[in-house]
Amino acid sequence: MLGLLGLLGAVVAGLAFDSGSDPREDERESQDTPEGEAWDVSAAYLGFGEDEDAGTDHGGTEPDGQPISNDIPTPTDPDRDLTGTAGADQMTGGSGQDHLTAGASDDYLDGRAGDDSLDGGAGQDVAHGGDGDDGLAGGDGDDSLWGDDGQDSLTGGAGNDVLAGCEGDDTAQGGAGNDLVSGGAGQDQLAGGAGDDTLLGGEGDDRVFGGTGADEVDGGAGNDTLWGAAPGAADTDVDILNGGEGDDTLHLGAGDYGHGGTGADSFTLQDFGPGAPLMQITDFDPAEDDLVVIYDSALHPDPQLSLTAGNGATLLLLDGVPLASLTAGSNIDLAAIRLQAA
């Protein structure tokens, strides 16, 4: 299980540094223009602000050999507001706060510098936020969204999407479909939404929600908080939670697997009543880990916990009903387990 998550993390990293053809090398804005209309041709679209030599001092030297400064400011692009068509658009922003809206096809959007808004619409879209705090939306279709630098917000929509926050404190929502969501460096908040998703917190103290479906959630380095489903949701799909490095908190629902990893971890078990699948914790260490059972006071007015030995594990029971299987490096004492009303 952990090998799969590591492999998927490598896939995300590899995609981010793909050396193949990249439409950003073309340095082009969208050439799709609605019939009967024309783009507003301004200095920005004629190349001002795109010249790497803009603002260079050509003032010569003083008699003492010191350079003369003309104090020429480097031109910056105005905010770009581009709307594509039903065709396959290539849209590039500048250094301002750009708004790029593509149509219903397989589009490429690159916000570049500035706090940009990118909307791919329907289709299999690729969008890069670039530097700045960007908002990216994929819409329907199997989209790839990259926040790049900055505190970015990514929304995949329907489809099997790849969302990568990259650098910064990012938020990412997969939506419907089997999504791959990666936070990267920073304190990220990730949600898979509906579908069987894989979520990778990366470096930093992350909050990661699997959502509905059978999800795999990996916190990575940092003190992370992981949920297989939305808090309190009666989701019986089997989720796999791995805390990774750091002191992590794992919230398990019915049938979920939890592995804290290195560090002093906390496991929270949500009771869903008789008949719910057993939760399993594979590395509970009573010497350093914490275990909390959340119960319904209407179903359990006077809750009692008990333990019984199993095949290589310890079975935890609530009012005589099996709740979870615990694999521990040493004997477990009930004093190490806390009860908490929902």
Q: Language-model features: where?
A:
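Short, surface-exposed beta-strand/loop "edge" segments at domain boundaries and coil↔beta transitions
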Residues: 257-259, 299-302, 321-326
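Long C-terminal tail modules that include membrane-anchoring/sorting signals and adjacent low-complexity
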Residues: 263-268, 275-278, 290-292, 316-317
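N-terminal segments that cap or nucleate solenoid repeat domains
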Residues: 25-112, 117
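Short beta-alpha junctions and helix-cap segments that line functional grooves
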Residues: 277-279, 303-305
